[in-house]
Amino acid sequence: MTRVCRALLFVLCGIFVHAQENELHFFGPRTDVLVVFTASREAQERETRAVQQLRLLVQDFEHQTPDVSVLVAITAHDHPPVPDFVPVDRLTGTKKLISLISSYKAPIVLILDETTGPPRLHTGAHRTVCPPWLLQAVYQHLTSHHVPIRYRDFDAILHRLGWLHEDPRHALYIKEHIPAVRMENSLYPPGALHTLPALLTQVYSEEWDTHYVSVSYGGTLYLIREQFFVILILGAVITLLLSLAIFSFLSDSRKRHYWNTILAMWWLPAILGVLSVCSVFVATQLTALFFLIRFGTHTSTGALPLLALIVKHSIAIALSCVCMANSKTIRDSMLHNGFIGGYLASTLCLLYAVLFSVIDFSLSAVFALEYALSLVFFSAQRKTTRRIMLAMMFLLFAPFLYAYLKNSAVTAPLSFHQSNVFFALGCVPFMLFMLTLFFEREKSHPRIPFIRRRNLLLSGALLTVLVINGVLWSVSLSSTRIPQEITACYRISERGLTLSLHSPLPIPRHIRARTHARLSTAEIQKAQDHLQISMDSRSYFGGRINVLEVRSQLRAQAIELRITSPHGTAAYEADRPFTRLEQGSVVRFISQARPPLPFTVTFSGDQNSTMQVQATVWTYDNPLQDAPPVMQDTTVRFIPMFELTRDVLFPSPSSQGVHATPEKNACIRDETVPNLQE
């Protein structure tokens, strides 16, 4: 049986036709550029202010038809109201919309969201930002219509670093290489959105520069393009070569002195780099250990991300200071050749302008500015000037530090798994600057013993660790005032009843326990009577078309089907997306959230094959008379949920006379479709 025949059969029989759940409104003639306004209903399918704004926009377009292609789409089932552990098809409406607009040559998407704060423009997701022409056009158009849109110029860099929360719908458009921006506002003035499609059609370009930086001033948005950063990196390389060649213009004695000092101190940045990386790695493991001891789970750092970052980096700084203070080699080298520390640090800044451009081109500009400040630091003779330059370098990275801590829910997973090396290497120039100032002070104040300053430093590091651990042990994840929500999932199958607890926060030790309760066969059968499975089988072209239907007396939140064919392929094609497992002998279907009942799946399979069907339904309705008790606690609020699983065996059509009916409430009907003449 060929795939063409199966597809033809599906079309002829009309077995599956799913209702379009997205609300679509097309306006204007069909052109290459399609401007899409879209918003999503909430989890309870309630219309948000953004959806209401789109309905007003539809009325405007009906009154005055645009001259370009415009689509107003209200998507459904993007925010399923089920816990994360329930396997449902998420972002269903957005996926359908993407498959629809992909037929156009140049779709442009504007996502509308409501907000309680000031209007804001979001340009990035999936570590990518929208094209610069789209950002500039939308920003200046809204400001010209007196919409006080808020856009932080620094957000473009943070989006590329992955340090900001991203909307999953926006990420889907970016992954499909569809230009998209997300606008948060409660209400737009009349005409602000109506005239936007014509402007976007005029400024559309296939160019997609992802490494730009924006500067907004006076209602105008200025863009620094990618070419600037390429030239900046080339300039950094040329400057580095010139800084090495400048030694040839020095006198022989000074040249020899500088080269001897550099050759004697070349190892210092390498040692500090290794020390910084090791300190951050050890601090990461110690922080995870402290949180494990305190909360009892390895994932507890995600529950308190800001505290986890503060603990980790405080320990890393303390370890680095302790190691540097106790290193006699570093002390002797800096006392005799301390002047070269600033030069080595400035050279590192120049190298980092090239190295960190691998992460993001715009970071090369930041390190180029740090290099300029480090040159002043190195050449300055007054200590006050050096301290001012060091403070300015700290201020240069202050926005990164603020965003790093503010968005700790996003940056903490990166910090604990991916970004340790780059973060540690980025601290090396500051370590060199601090060492230079520290040992210059020792030279100017020889009466203060070094051992006293070292002990003071060690005492400060130890006190920092003790204070942090005291704060850690005083923090609680839940309280009687704000109880922790835990989903208690009762799993009912032929094996009996099990209870599992799920929560985005770590579950306390005295509550985190799995209960294995026993149910009698009669109780299991009574619970499974709420779930009926039937299959209609049709023979066609040497194969079979199967229509599997799941009915439930319970209000289903999600449904999962696993179809197993032990001696063949479970499914070749189907009317729903599915996943093949175990080389095709098992297929898996998952529904959207709150699927309409009965849940029907149509698929093609082998002519004579035995099928094992496992249906799982998640519901908040109780199929049992009495649910097993859960431990009561004033700091926890339990949400009961039930996972009902039923297995049904459908024998092959050739053996139906031998086998009995599969099960109660499970039936199979066999019909033969006459062969169609070609």
From Swiss-Prot:
It is found in: Cell membrane. One of its GO terms (cellular component) is plasma membrane. It is a multi-pass membrane protein. Its main location: membrane. This is Uncharacterized protein TP_0564. Keywords: Cell membrane, Membrane, Transmembrane, Transmembrane helix. Residues 653-678 are annotated as: Disordered. The lineage of its organism: Bacteria, Pseudomonadati, Spirochaetota, Spirochaetia, Spirochaetales. Signal peptide: none annotated. Disulfide bonds: none annotated. The keyword Cytoplasm does not apply. The chain crosses the membrane at residues 228-250, 263-285, 300-322, 334-356, 361-380, 387-405, 420-439, 455-477.
